[in-house]
């Protein structure tokens, strides 16, 4: 009996290219429609083009309007949230990993608690506390509240980086006379550096796209693109809302494009290596 019948054939390079282009087309079609709307003023359903092409929204963005200032403020907030969340997640995951027995299980369960409620509900519950300590309506208050969810996600991811290999490396460095800095440099950093980028990007994207926390804790005093987008929608400014949506989705789309191209490049290299082996 021919055993090759039970082996699934690997997709060819041409098939992978076709699939990638199809997925890319489906993803980019809504973005192209939003880009078209942002190039002009007015729009009537079911038309695909604005009433007139005058580049009004982009001119408003170029003169540093409220949209551009909200984008810059949101970018700063997301970067700060990613940095704080990744740092806290690294410390918390290390502490939980060094616990034993029921205490470790309790720590792992506590980390999952922020995922039990939505950020908007948590922001409503934390508003009174933030108002009492003077953080309501401030950049710092929004940052700390967003970091609760970002730190929880980073901790869950980084818990996978603390295994027996990391513990053995740490013991080896200490046996060779290394200090705390040497332990972090030679034992801990090589083990978790690949996860730190994932934690930072995930936390930063959460802060960039967040609406509930910024609305309730910020109280409208911390401008971000999400707040500006819903304001434009309520004001029926479809063209400016399309531009705000493009800016809001640009980091995620950029990351998706880079990952897709990188994955396709790796797949092609593997396919070429297999063909050379044959």
Q: Where are the model-predicted features located?
A:
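Short hydrophobic faces within alpha-helices
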Residues: 71, 96, 113, 160, ...
């Amino acid at each position: 009996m021919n055993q090759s019948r039970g082996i699934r054939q690997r997709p060819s390079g041409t098939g992978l290219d076709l699939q990638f282009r199809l997925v890319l087309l489906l993803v980019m079609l809504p973005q192209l429609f939003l880009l078209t709307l942002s190039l002009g003023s007015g729009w009537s359903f079911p038309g695909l083009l604005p009433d007139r092409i005058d580049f009004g929204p982009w001119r408003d963005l170029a003169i540093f309007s409220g949209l551009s200032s909200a984008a810059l403020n949101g970018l700063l907030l997301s970067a700060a949230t990613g940095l704080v969340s990744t740092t806290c997640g690294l410390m918390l995951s290390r502490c939980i990993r060094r616990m034993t027995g029921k205490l470790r299980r309790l720590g792992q369960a506590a980390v999952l608690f922020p995922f039990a409620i939505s950020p908007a509900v948590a922001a409503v519950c934390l508003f009174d506390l933030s108002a009492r300590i003077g953080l309501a309506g401030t950049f710092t208050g929004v940052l700390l509240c967003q970091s609760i969810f970002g730190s929880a996600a980073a901790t869950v991811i980084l818990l996978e980086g603390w295994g027996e290999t990391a513990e053995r490396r740490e013991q080896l460095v200490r046996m060779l006379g290394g200090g705390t800095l040497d332990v972090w440099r030679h034992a801990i950093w090589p083990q978790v550096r690949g996860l730190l980028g994932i934690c930072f990007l995930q936390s930063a994207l959460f802060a960039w796209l967040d609406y509930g926390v910024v609305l309730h804790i910020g109280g409208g005093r911390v401008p971000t693109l999400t707040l500006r987008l819903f304001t434009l929608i309520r004001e029926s400014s479809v063209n400016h809302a399309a531009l705000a949506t493009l800016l809001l989705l640009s980091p995620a789309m950029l990351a998706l494009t880079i990952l897709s191209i990188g994955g396709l490049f790796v797949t092609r290299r593997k396919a070429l290596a297999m063909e050379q082996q044959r």
